[in-house]
């Protein structure tokens, strides 16, 4: 089952992306480098909970 997750910017801008992940294949915290339009550069995004 794919669960919805929120990717929070590590730049502290408050920007986030939403996506899904398969917890069976990826049990750990998800991290990916994506573009932050507020900071206008690529930064690390880390997994957080959707409230």
Swiss-Prot record:
One MF term in the entry's GO annotations: structural constituent of ribosome
Assigned GO CC terms: cytosolic large ribosomal subunit
Biological processes per GO annotation: translation
Amino acid composition bias (Polar residues), ranges on this chain: 7-20
UniProt cross-references to Gene3D superfamilies, sorted A to Z: Ribosomal protein L33
InterPro entries documented for this protein: Ribosomal_bL33, Ribosomal_bL33_CS, Ribosomal_bL33_sf, Ribosomal_zn-bd
Keywords: Ribonucleoprotein, Ribosomal protein
Region described as Disordered: spans on this chain: 1-23
Taxonomic superkingdom: Bacteria
HAMAP family linked: Ribosomal_bL33
Family, per entry: Belongs to the bacterial ribosomal protein bL33 family.
Protein name listed in UniProt: Large ribosomal subunit protein bL33
Naturally occurring in which organism (per UniProt): Saccharophagus degradans (strain 2-40 / ATCC 43961 / DSM 17024)
């Amino acid at each position: 089952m794919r669960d919805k997750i929120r990717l929070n910017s590590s730049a502290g801008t408050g920007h986030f992306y939403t996506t899904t992940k398969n917890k069976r294949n990826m049990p750990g915290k998800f991290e990916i480098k994506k573009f932050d339009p507020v900071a206008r550069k690529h930064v690390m995004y880390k997994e957080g909970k959707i409230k």
